[in-house]
Amino acid sequence: MYSVSIIGASGYSGAELTRLLLRHPGVELQELYAFSQAGKAVSELYPLLSSDKVYKPYGGECESDVYFLALPHGEALQLVPPLVKAGKTVIDLSGDFRLKSTVEHEQFYKQQKSPEAVMTYGMSELFREEIIKAKAISNPGCFATSIILGVAPLLLGNDSSINVRGINCTSTSGISGAGRSSKTELSFSEMSENIRAYKVGLHQHIPEIMQTLGTSVTTPSFDFTFTPMIGSLVRGIYSILTVNLENPAEAEQIKALYKEFYKEAPFVRVRDTMTEVRHVAHTNFCDIHIAHATANGTLIIVTAIDNLLKGAAGQAIQNMNLMLGMNEKTGLSF
């Protein structure tokens, strides 16, 4: 049995990792490291987690076999290299190691990093073999997951008649996507019965999406726009993807392409009916529905995920399972 520890365990993603790893049959949860919450019991912050473990400050320990890092952007850059050098299996949930371009990283994250600070991108539906061989994984972002899975078959599939001219994405996330820290704009009084856009055209997941789909922000091969929004739900991401094709395609043709593309992906469900956030909440599933296809080549695709699971902790454990030679569904039955 593998020993596992979490660095940054007191945030929402860290709490979900804790919950899932406590019941995972192939690992033993060893240490929970946190900075601002060090010294507090897990059950004090999260009564749902009936664990007697106490959050500890992290001081560079590397006794566990596997380390998850669920820290704010920028904080993993210095912590990951020593763990990798020590031969540990590492899965980082931040954006610190996702982008190959240091220019794009600095532009969108407002932080500098070295060109070597890149790890295998942990989206098993696209990079399964690379993940199996990897020792260090950069877990995808939540918005990026909902969008990439929603359009990947069109850009990376084997139907040569499909040529994408442009993609417009509007995605609404639950408030938990903004993290656990107290902010006035995220308070109940501000967010109840409310929805608002933010970082329009500037969100840090834009270059991640473009990179994964085989293009880039600086030299795009298709038009791409992204409007992220936050709404008055706790968890979930609901994405409406409007795709412009060079040539029209029937909805049934697109649906068949998607089902073939994801036939070996246990956590992607191509639905015949409209997706809803409540159908994926508290699960590791991504639900996709081909909602409409017009005569002028416009597709409307709708996806739904749980931002804390398929968009964070669940996908991270899915990656761990593959890296350790387990069935990727282990510990993720819902």
Curated annotation (Swiss-Prot):
Source taxon at top rank: Bacteria
Keyword Iron annotated: no
GO cellular component, one term: cytoplasm
An example Gene Ontology biological process: L-arginine biosynthetic process
Active site: C142
One Pfam assignment: Semialdhyde_dh
Subcellular localization: Cytoplasm
Top-tier EC class: oxidoreductase
Major location (coarse): cytoplasm
Catalysed conversion reaction: N-acetyl-L-glutamate 5-semialdehyde + phosphate + NADP(+) = N-acetyl-L-glutamyl 5-phosphate + NADPH + H(+)
NCBIfam families in alphabetical order: argC
Function according to Swiss-Prot or TrEMBL: Catalyzes the NADPH-dependent reduction of N-acetyl-5-glutamyl phosphate to yield N-acetyl-L-glutamate 5-semialdehyde.
Name the record gives this protein: N-acetyl-gamma-glutamyl-phosphate reductase
Species, as recorded: Pelodictyon phaeoclathratiforme (strain DSM 5477 / BU-1)
Gene: argC
